[in-house]
């Protein structure tokens, strides 16, 4: 099955979900219909594992906009396969979990599952894209679908603010990324990613290389919640827990990392890129791990935990980027090891973090709270979630016999080897190791502290009242399956390493097959070495801090109020006030003012073009023959048009406006264009009647008195616009030896079977344009109808 067919299949499922929204009896099954999408994609991508391992990559290219080199280019290599498997397999768990989490009585299920499937479609589109513009389209689609999912419970103010904040930050990064893609096109002349990476040595010497890197980093850092753009992720936790488990731990937040990995053969040629990514990753890792201890909401803890873990992966992506410069050197094995660790931890993090979010969701759903100050001794009420969250949290902390331990060891090993790399000195290595270890200590602390507070703190009936709480098996099943994978991967890591991670490494290295020999063999025991010593230190210090310190009392008062998010809110409020003032100044409910502004901008653009290029010489001028009748009709049209400016009665204005149209009809007849005359007559008659009929539904608001200054502006704009239109007509008549498109229509109109060139153009040559013009009118009408029938939707949260 082609990659295009897979995407089409997902779109068909989305259409089925939309159809179910019209039938309440079927709406409750929307989740199970939506579940088909990740199941199909998972089966499809798992079937491709052997082929991709043998370098048999799938690719599809469908021309779209050839002149701009924008095509539907899709490519399935090792890197896109690994991410597609994560998106699809985690998707199965999340979609099934959502069927148990959401209520068919209280929630609009088809709407939710449509948004969730749209997001999955967008993420798969990102990782399969082999065209930069196509990737950007899918990139922004993830922002849109994320906005819709976060604001799913739209009556909640936190959901609305979180959705807007995440949308603004990620779209800002997306626009920066688009600028980077445009720079790449300027440097290479192509939008095809495979071709771009093949020109890496040429691009690195271009003047736009460094600006392009900064644009890429803005896109990646905003999407993957890196400091200081991390602030949207905690706010996004207002979304339903299935959304948090899928978007904000396993998939969407990994899109920025995917971007950097995909372009590592190009970006890694710059040492500045390596330094920035490594530094930002370390800061993010440290900041996230410390801030997680300040949270009382379990989802808040997991949000900052995700930020910290993403920073950890980003550090390895940054250090490993040097592989692009040293593919043939002896130290290439170190870079390969670091990149392998980044991919390995990316996979591990998706598993244990998704399990943690699901566990928190079950606690919230059944116990009614996520506050660690309220929840206590939950191991008795939720034995399965005690097991799931304990194992997943310990894996995140890097405890032995769990998958997180292996990738955490690789991370520490990578940090200790940076001193051997040309980009880092001994002092910088010590600083990197120090920050990495401190961040890891706090990671261990909040992971253990979270489990201790929720499941092992002594029960206090004054704080939390035990209710009829149950722990359904179907609800717990997805998290239990993910929990089982945590120790399984520890004992058989190389099954995943050789089948999934090594092919992904090939893609990161731009197809260098030597990387197969350089890829590490993951062992559970490496003997006593520096990374193991650092792990022991982390476990000891983290255990002491988690058990002996009451972090609920540490971060209080002013310390707790320090937040980067507050800076964002302050800037947001100022921009909002500024926009409100500008809006009130511009939007004064005067349609003619809006038209003047629109035409004014158009005239400025045309005028600027005339100034830059200059007016062409008019050496030929074609003017149709005209007689006294045409002159009289033209004078009548102009006279009525000018009189409309000074007339105050609405009905008179409408009638005179119709008269202008009928005079133009006579002008067409005089010019021997009967078809145009008939069309003009019909349109003018219908619009005039509609105008008059609409008066019965419009308020009787008298028109303001004539203002001499305002009327002069209107006349001036009209005359200037007429002058520009006439000048453009003259310019188009100067062929300069080039063939005109009119000649094509004149010669080819007989092929359409039409007897009139105008009909042939409207009905055949630009039939799609005519069709879409009609669709635009229909959509506009539906929009107006919706606004007229809009009722303020207020009420309680849909969960209640």
Curated annotation (Swiss-Prot):
Cellular compartments annotated: Cell membrane
Q: Is Transmembrane helix set as a keyword in this record?
A: yes
Bilayer disposition of the protein:
Multi-pass membrane protein
Q: Which InterPro entries match?
A: CPA3_Na-H_Antiporter_A, MrpA_C/MbhD, MrpA_C/MbhE, ND/Mrp_TM, Proton_antipo_N
Keywords, A to Z? Antiport, Cell membrane, Ion transport, Membrane, Transmembrane, Transmembrane helix, Transport
- One Gene Ontology MF term: antiporter activity
Q: Which residues are listed as membrane-spanning? A: 1-21, 33-53, 78-98, 118-138, 167-187, 213-233, 241-261, 273-293, 300-320, 331-351, 387-407, 424-444, 472-492, 527-547, 595-615, 627-647, 651-671, 676-696, 712-732, 768-788
This protein's major location comes to: membrane
Q: Extract the NCBIfam families matched here.
A: PRK12646.1
- Subunit structure, briefly? May form a heterooligomeric complex that consists of seven subunits: mnhA2, mnhB2, mnhC2, mnhD2, mnhE2, mnhF2 and mnhG2.
Q: What is this protein called?
A: Putative antiporter subunit mnhA2
Q: Gene encoding this polypeptide?
A: mnhA2
